[in-house]
């Protein structure tokens, strides 16, 4: 029996009017088209919207952090200096940015001033006196610390008496109050632990806790409204704690630097006897621990890196990194390669730690790579040739030096004195670095200030 041939040709689609089968096929074709064009259903849930926004913000934040980190890595090699002329002021010890164009500074000659980085204009700010200003004026100390509270509405610094704490209101710099009954020696460092509470560290080995209450602020406003002469309150300390004293050298237990960890409410303190102290700092000060530093000479600066949960301590030639959660023998230290001049200032910005030295150098340490940033090869005409692999180092300008009797008798045969970087600070954008200081020898009178951008 012969097999019936089967055609492999497809049948032509039926016309629209060909009956129910044709309608089914046509319906099937439309359904296929519909399936191809179908989009995900729109979720109108508030929870879904918030989660989607959170993911988007996380991506944007991650990208922003990468961008800021890259900028922090590349910026130091691009910075150029512009010096400011400060007249006859002596050694800038402290500085903070007030806004995008103003920096407030304190000097060894006890002068508080604001410099406009765009116009170079200098404006001096009246310093605040004790309620009983009959004490002997202390020479050679000055203003060692300036700190802004977290909301940037109050500024804390030293007073006319370097043992006292002075509080100003921002942005007007109107006086608010003076804490003048706490320390018996100079204030070396200040740290805000909240918007209204600050801690001062003194050369007498004590730490004072001060509170600027709403009552003090209200009365300050009322006084300013009725008087054109600056009037301010006088406050007393809320707590006064002595740091532990080493038996072998009790006279050198001077609180030199403070740094606050806002996440854990912990306050780090460095004393000149070579110890790091950690305190719980909320409504009072409670000691948590004390540990001997691996390099214990000239420990004069301290900074806290919140992202890395470590404190950076400067010494005569090293920067040491302390994590209070780790044993003391795990402390890592790096050498600045400028022995003898000392680390005078230190700060965190992103993953870069900026180090200011007594030789007028700025060094940049990458905490992720655990090494200093290095020079790039430069082929610019007329520039000093630099070897690849050398640490990137920026050097401060000439500044001003008073050729007084001390200079004539002891230093006149020396052609040039580097300006120690006693203070430096980045602006909010991280693209401008204010640097200031003066000659390292205590007997020399001079100053330096510059904007690196």
UniProtKB/Swiss-Prot annotation:
Region (Disordered): 1-26
Family matches, as SMART domains: WD40 (SM00320)
Record's keyword annotation contains Mitochondrion: no
GO molecular function: ubiquitin-like ligase-substrate adaptor activity
SUPFAM superfamilies membership: WD40 repeat-like
Chief location category: cytoplasm
Annotated spans, Required for nuclear location and interaction with MOV10: 1-38
Coiled coil: none
Localization per record: Cytoplasm; Cytoplasm, Cytoskeleton, Microtubule organizing center, Centrosome; Nucleus
Modified residues (Phosphoserine): 15
Subunit structure: Component of the DCX(DCAF12) E3 ubiquitin ligase complex, at least composed of CUL4 (CUL4A or CUL4B), DDB1, DCAF12 and RBX1.
Name of the protein in its database record: DDB1- and CUL4-associated factor 12
Gene: DCAF12
């Amino acid at each position: 029996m012969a097999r019936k041939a089967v055609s492999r040709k497809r049948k032509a689609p039926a016309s629209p009017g060909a009956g129910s089968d044709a309608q089914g096929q046509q319906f099937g074709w439309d359904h296929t088209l519909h399936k191809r064009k179908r989009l995900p259903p729109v979720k109108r849930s508030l929870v879904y919207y918030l989660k989607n926004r959170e993911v988007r913000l996380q991506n944007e934040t991650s990208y922003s952090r990468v961008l800021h980190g890259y900028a922090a890595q590349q910026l130091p090699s691009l910075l150029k200096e512009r010096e400011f002329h400060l007249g006859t002021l002596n050694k800038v010890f402290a500085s903070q940015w007030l806004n995008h164009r103003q920096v407030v500074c304190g000097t060894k000659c006890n002068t508080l001033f604001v410099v406009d980085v765009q116009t170079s204009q200098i404006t001096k700010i009246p310093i605040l006196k004790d309620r009983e200003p009959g004490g002997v004026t202390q020479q050679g100390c000055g203003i060692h610390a300036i700190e802004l509270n977290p909301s940037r509405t109050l500024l804390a610094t030293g007073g006319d008496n370097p043992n006292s704490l002075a509080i100003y209101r921002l942005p007007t710099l109107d006086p608010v109050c003076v804490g003048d009954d706490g320390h018996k020696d100079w204030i070396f460092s200040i740290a805000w632990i909240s918007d209204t509470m600050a801690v001062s560290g003194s050369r007498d080995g004590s730490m004072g806790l001060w509170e600027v209450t709403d009552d003090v602020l209200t009365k300050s406003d009322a006084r300013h409204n009725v008087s054109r002469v600056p009037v301010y309150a006088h406050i007393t300390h809320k707590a006064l704690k002595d740091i532990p004293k080493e038996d072998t050298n009790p006279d050198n237990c001077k609180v030199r630097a403070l740094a606050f960890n806002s996440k854990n409410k912990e306050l780090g303190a460095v004393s000149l006897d070579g110890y790091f102290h950690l305190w719980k700092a909320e409504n009072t000060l409670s000691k948590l621990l004390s540990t001997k530093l691996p390099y214990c000479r000239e420990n004069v600066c301290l900074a806290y890196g919140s992202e890395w949960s470590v404190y950076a301590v400067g010494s005569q030639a090293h920067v040491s990194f302390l994590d209070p959660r780790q044993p003391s023998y795990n402390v890592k230290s790096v050498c600045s390669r400028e022995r003898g001049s000392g680390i005078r200032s230190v700060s965190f910005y992103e993953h870069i730690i900026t180090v200011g030295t007594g030789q007028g150098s700025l060094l940049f340490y990458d905490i992720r790579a655990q090494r200093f940033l290095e020079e790039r090869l430069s082929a610019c005409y007329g520039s000093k040739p630099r070897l690849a692999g050398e640490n990137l180092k920026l050097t401060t300008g000439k500044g001003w030096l008073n050729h007084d009797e001390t200079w004539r008798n002891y230093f006149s045969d020396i052609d040039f004195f580097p300006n120690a970087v006693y203070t430096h600070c980045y602006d909010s954008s991280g693209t401008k670095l204010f640097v200031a200081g003066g000659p390292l020898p205590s007997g020399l009178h001079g100053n330096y200030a510059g904007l690196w951008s």
